[in-house]
Amino acid sequence: MPASGGKTAPPPGSGPGGPVRLTWVQPEDLVGHEFRQAAEDGRGETAEPLLRVWLAAGGHLAPARAGASPTPAPPELRALATDLLTALAALPTPAEPAARPDPAGHGAARAPGSSGRPLAPGRGGAGTRTEAGSGVGGRARFAGPRADAAGDGPALRRRLEAAWLGRAVGCVLGKPVEKLPLHGIRALARAAGNWPLGDWFTERGVPPEVLAAHPWNRRSAPTSLAENIDGTPEDDDLNYPLLGLLLLQRHGKGFTTADVGRLWLDELPAGRTFTAERVAYRNLLQGLEPPATATHHNPFREWIGALIRADVHGWTNPGAPAAAAAQAHRDAALTHTGNGAHAAAFVAAATATAATGRADVHTALRAGLAVVPPRSRLAEAVRFGIRAAADVRDTAAGFDTVVDLLHARYGRYHWVHSVPNTAVIAAALTHADGDFTHSVCRAVSGGWDTDSNGATAGALAGLIAGSPDAIPHRWTAPLKNRLATTVPGFDGIGFDTLAHLTAQEAARS
């Protein structure tokens, strides 16, 4: 995500004495992103007259990579942006094809712009019904009995520790190059003799002109290069699994979407949220209820934020991909709809399958796809990524070809959108075929949201590895079994302790 610990660079004028200029919430920036979302979800033609009004008034398109445009809009332009956001929300959205009907009826989806009434308090076991925002993704159904959770006890705890470690490794690996374009990532790694990517990024040996052309993520480089990693730095890709664990400790697997919102208000600093999460947080403070928190003036509702919250739902439902997907959808409904929620369900189901200790990575990915509407944009992208990765030889050079294909096909999306990022995660895991190092390195070398992709791929690859000892020491040693976070009660915690706490929640009914 764009991302951790306030990683998004502040716009000019936002330093001491300047305006606050909070990112990801300014109407003049949100409306540009909503026009982009409209083009993606089938409203582009009907939105065109509104776009002409916006541009004629002096408005701009969405910032390509930053969270805010360089300067604030004048009051009249900001008011117009707010009005246009409301008008865009009223445009009918062509629905994507629905998932196949399922008698259990988990996770019935809700269309964009639907009523802001609170979600029905679903109880997330098999045979129950939960509601989640769907955007344009059609009706997502999560069905099936809970499978026997193989390997409970010590074996499950070892897998969970490997998953937590894998998530941390992949996240930290991707942090220095987050927001960089693909050619910049490749240039930095090649200059260090680290391409194909196989180790931590480093500044050692990189010529000054390369560093000047492709500067590291300025917030992450001091804590995430090979020469300075000293424990696991804070990141939203690690904060959200902690919050998910806290959610389950307080409310159990029957939590409601409203429970998620209350937990955030109690325990999550607003400044540690980004994109859809920040907009939803603002909506909560304005008195809106889910699912309106996910839809009201939230152009980021199909981005990657719900996906990075999904692992804990899979970890705590080993062998029960349907239940994991239903939990993830209920969590996602606070902030995301459509493909954003589908991505969370995909990861949760794949993770739950891998958590048994009996499935290979390809079986896990198939389980993830089984809970996604098969004709949604997300399912199409994941299938494309898997096919592309399966069609090339299992070498890093071959994966460069896969990445080039993905960027050619999905480069129109924002770099934080769920569709391209889920595709590259699936492609990386497929190509790596269960190898931990290859999984995280392929995911990060694919570009886009590098720390989120590395984290998700690393978590699933850790489960497949089955034990912390199966992850190469060069990855785990610098993290020192220590995680920094602003989530209360967790700062400095070890991954072994997190595995124990997660296993306790997995054992709860």
Stretches with model-predicted labels:
Residues P112-G116, G122, G138-L165, V169, ...:
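An N-terminal structural lobe/cap that precedes and organizes the functional/catalytic core
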Residues P72-P154:
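Long amphipathic alpha-helical scaffold segments
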Residues L182, R190, W195, V206, ...:
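Surface-exposed loop and adjacent secondary-structure segments within mature catalytic domains
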Residues H214-P233, A397, G494-S509:
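C-terminal domain-closing interface element
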Residues A221-V260, W264-T273:
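Aromatic-rich carbohydrate-recognition surfaces in CAZymes
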Residues V169-K175, K179-L197, H336-N339, A345-T353, ...:
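Catalytic phosphate/nucleotide-handling subdomain of diverse soluble enzymes
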Residues G107, R139-D152, E277-I304, I308-A324, ...:
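Accessory "access/gating" subregions that flank catalytic or transport cores
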Residues M1-P101, G107:
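Long, charge-dense tracts
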